[in-house]
């Protein structure tokens, strides 16, 4: 099911937004070039919110320990993380961000 997250203009390029869906937190990321990605908002190395991290066009970096994750796949690209994080399909319709999410 596609869930509406926010207006595209509410998410600035190079930033991430933490969104709670029930007990599950997602990081909705807008890259500096304007692409929008969605992934679990928890570093696989620890209980750290990725949405507070550093965003570039291909990765998000955990602010606490520096683990980087590929935005398209959730694959860890640097230690200390070695487990991937889940990613979710993003849809943009009428300048609104939606995420495909099944509970």
What does each model-identified segment do?
Residues 1-8:
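Short amphipathic
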Residues 16-103:
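Rieske [2Fe-2S] iron-sulfur-binding domain
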């Amino acid at each position: 099911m596609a869930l509406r997250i926010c207006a595209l203009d509410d998410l600035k390029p190079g930033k991430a937004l933490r969104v709670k869906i029930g007990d599950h937190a997602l990081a909705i990321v807008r890259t500096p070039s304007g692409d929008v990605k969605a992934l679990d908002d928890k570093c696989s190395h620890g209980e750290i919110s990725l949405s507070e991290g550093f965003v570039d066009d291909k990765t998000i970096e955990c602010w606490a320990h520096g683990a980087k994750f590929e935005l398209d796949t959730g694959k860890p690209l640097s230690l200390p993380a070695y487990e991937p994080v889940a990613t979710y399909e993003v849809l943009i319709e009428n300048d609104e961000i939606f995420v495909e999410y099944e509970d």
